[in-house]
C-alpha cells in the first residue's frame, strides 16, 4: 500500500459520484478511481446475497488497479457487505452509513430523525441501529423511496416528474415532526433541492456520502497513506457497467468536469442478472 496509489469508490450506479464530488473538494491531492454498476442498478430491491456478490465483483475489479483504500459509496451495499469486505481486505474499507448516523445524532435538536433510502437499506435497519447505539432515546422514522434512484439514473433529477414523485413519496414524513433527515442513499443528494423544498427549511438534510469523506480523510492520516502533494497525480478514472455516454453526461454535469471520459466494463456473468 503506497501513498501514491488511488482511492477506489464503488456504487450501484451514479449515486456514489456525490461522494466523489465531496472527495474532490476535501482531498484535492488524491487520485480517485470510480466504478458504478449501472447495468445492474438499482441494488435496493435485490436479495442481500446478490448485493454482496455484486459488491465483491466491483471491489475485485478495483483491487486489480492497486487501490490503497476502498469506499463503498452505496448505502445498500454498505448495509449488507461492509463488514465481510472489511474483514477480508488488507486495506482500509469505509462505508457510508455510520458517518451519516453520527452526523444526524449531532445535529438533531428534538430527537426526531428521518431516514430515506432504498428498500434494502431500510429493511436492514442499519441507520436505526447505528443511531440508537449512539442515542437510544432518539425516535427514528424510516421510509423507502423506490422511485428516487431510477429518476437519477435516467438523468431526470431536475425534471417536473422528479418534483412530483418526491412530493408524493415524502408526504408520509411531513407530519412526523422531524428536524433532521438522512439522505440514506448516495443518489439522493442529486435530488437535494427538491427534497429540501418538500420537507421545508426547518429540516436539516444529512448527506451520508459527504460525511463519509471526513472519515476517509481521517483514515488517510491515521494510516499515513495520504498522497504527498509534491508527487505527480495521475488522472482520475471512471468505469461503468452501463452506458458510458449516459454516465459521462451525468458525471460531467454533476462534477463540473468537461470532457469527462468513462469506460464501459463487464462484471460477473450476465450484466443484468
UniProtKB/Swiss-Prot annotation:
It is an enzyme of class 5 (isomerase). NCBIfam families: glut_race (TIGR00067), PRK00865.1-3 (NF002035). Signal peptide: none annotated. GO terms for molecular function: glutamate racemase activity; identical protein binding. Its EC number is 5.1.1.3. It comes from Enterococcus faecalis (strain ATCC 700802 / V583). Pathway: Cell wall biogenesis; peptidoglycan biosynthesis. Substrate binds at residues 11-12, 43-44, 75-76, 186-187. HAMAP family: Glu_racemase. It catalyses: L-glutamate = D-glutamate. The keyword Cytoplasm does not apply. The active site is at residues 74, 185. GO terms for biological process: cell wall organization; peptidoglycan biosynthetic process; regulation of cell shape. Belongs to the aspartate/glutamate racemases family. This is Glutamate racemase.
Amino acid at each position: 500500500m503506497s501513498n501514491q496509489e488511488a482511492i477506489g469508490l464503488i456504487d450501484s450506479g451514479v449515486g456514489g459520484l456525490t461522494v466523489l464530488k465531496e472527495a474532490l473538494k476535501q482531498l484535492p491531492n488524491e487520485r480517485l478511481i470510480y466504478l458504478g454498476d449501472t447495468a445492474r442498478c438499482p441494488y435496493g430491491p435485490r436479495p442481500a446475497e446478490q448485493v454482496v456478490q455484486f459488491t465483491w465483483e466491483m471491489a475485485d475489479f478495483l483491487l486489480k488497479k492497486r487501490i490503497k483504500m476502498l469506499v463503498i459509496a452505496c448505502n445498500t451495499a454498505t448495509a449488507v457487505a461492509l463488514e465481510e469486505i472489511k474483514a477480508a481486505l488488507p486495506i482500509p474499507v469505509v462505508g457510508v452509513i455510520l458517518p451519516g448516523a453520527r452526523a444526524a445524532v449531532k445535529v438533531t435538536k428534538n430527537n426526531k430523525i428521518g431516514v430515506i433510502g432504498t428498500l434494502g437499506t431500510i429493511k436492514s435497519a442499519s441507520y436505526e441501529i447505528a443511531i440508537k447505539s449512539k442515542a437510544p432515546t432518539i425516535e427514528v422514522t424510516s421510509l423507502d423511496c423506490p422511485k428516487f434512484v431510477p429518476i437519477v439514473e435516467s438523468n431526470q433529477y431536475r425534471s417536473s416528474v422528479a418534483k412530483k414523485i418526491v412530493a408524493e413519496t415524502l408526504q408520509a414524513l411531513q407530519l412526523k415532526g422531524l428536524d433532521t433527515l438522512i439522505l440514506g442513499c448516495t443518489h439522493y443528494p442529486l435530488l437535494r433541492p427538491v427534497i429540501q423544498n418538500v420537507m421545508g427549511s426547518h429540516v436539516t438534510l444529512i448527506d451520508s456520502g459527504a460525511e463519509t469523506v471526513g472519515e476517509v480523510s481521517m483514515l488517510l492520516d491515521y494510516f499515513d497513506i495520504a498522497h504527498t502533494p509534491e508527487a505527480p497525480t495521475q488522472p482520475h478514472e471512471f468505469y461503468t457497467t452501463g452506458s458510458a455516454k449516459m454516465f459521462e453526461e451525468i458525471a460531467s454535469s454533476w462534477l463540473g468536469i468537461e470532457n469527462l471520459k468513462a469506460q464501459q466494463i463487464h462484471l460477473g456473468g450476465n450484466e443484468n442478472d
